[in-house]
Regions:
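Bacterial Sec-dependent N-terminal signal peptides
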Residues: 1-24
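N-terminal alpha-helical interaction modules that lie
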Residues: 20-90, 144, 152-211
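TPR repeat positional signature
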Residues: 80, 114-117, 121
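Boundary/linker segments of alpha-helical solenoid repeat arrays
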Residues: 111-112, 139-152
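TPR/TPR-like (Sel1-like) alpha-helical repeat modules
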Residues: 122-145, 173
Length: 211
């Protein structure tokens, strides 16, 4: 999304520091499609939509990284998302809510859609829906936070896309004063964000190269 939402100071106090969990993508794929699994997609998405605060870190990990195995995701290049982005750029927040709800119903763990809805509910003073979606955002960004410590290539934070990387950087309060270097791997790209002696490693997963 070209028009990133820069209101994360509202979100930072909610950003968690949970236990690091090993990322097993094959196991996540298996669990999500197994109707008997506690981590079955339909079961998790029902909780995510209705009671996000009841979801634990392992469930959040399945929801975020499980996006890689879904075929029904909203694409940023699709006409529906472009229409939503245009409404957002025009500050038409009522229309953003209308369009955002439609895309959210199709792809509830889409960070861009959640962020636009958050901004729109903030502008329209809808505290209830704002609080609900901020809980969802916290879950998904915590899943990224718990995927590593970001201190080395081996322990890099892992994201599904470049777009999610920039959202995560905003949540981490990494500004434009950081420089980026990139390294291509067999299963993705590692970006090294550097400011002085501080380095943050973020890996963008390319699952078509893994499986």
């Amino acid at each position: 999304m070209n028009c990133r939402i820069l209101f994360f100071l509202l979100i930072l106090p909610f950003f968690g520091f949970g236990q690091k969990t090993k990322l097993d993508l094959k196991n996540i794929e298996k669990n999500l499609s197994n109707p008997k699994s506690a981590y079955n997609y339909d079961r998790l998405i029902f909780k995510f939509r209705g009671l996000p605060k009841s979801i634990d870190s392992t469930e959040a990990q399945h929801l975020y990284y499980g996006r890689n195995f879904r075929k029904d995701l909203v694409s940023q290049t699709g006409d529906d998302f472009k229409e939503l982005a245009e409404a957002f750029k025009s500050n038409n927040f009522i229309e953003c809510i209308r369009l955002g709800k439609i895309l959210y119903s199709k792809d509830p763990t889409n960070l861009d859609v959640i962020l636009i809805l958050l901004r729109s509910y903030d502008q329209t003073k809808d505290i209830g829906n704002f609080a609900h979606h901020i809980s969802q955002l916290r879950l998904l960004t915590d899943a990224i936070k718990n995927s590593g410590d970001g201190k080395s290539e081996k322990t890099a934070f892992k994201v599904n896309s470049v777009g999610d990387e920039y959202i995560f950087l905003n949540v981490m309060n990494v500004g434009q004063d950081y420089t980026r270097a990139s390294k291509t791997l067999k299963d993705g790209i590692v970006d090294i964000w550097e400011k002085g002696d501080n380095k943050i490693y973020i890996k963008v997963l390319y699952l078509d190269l893994i499986f």
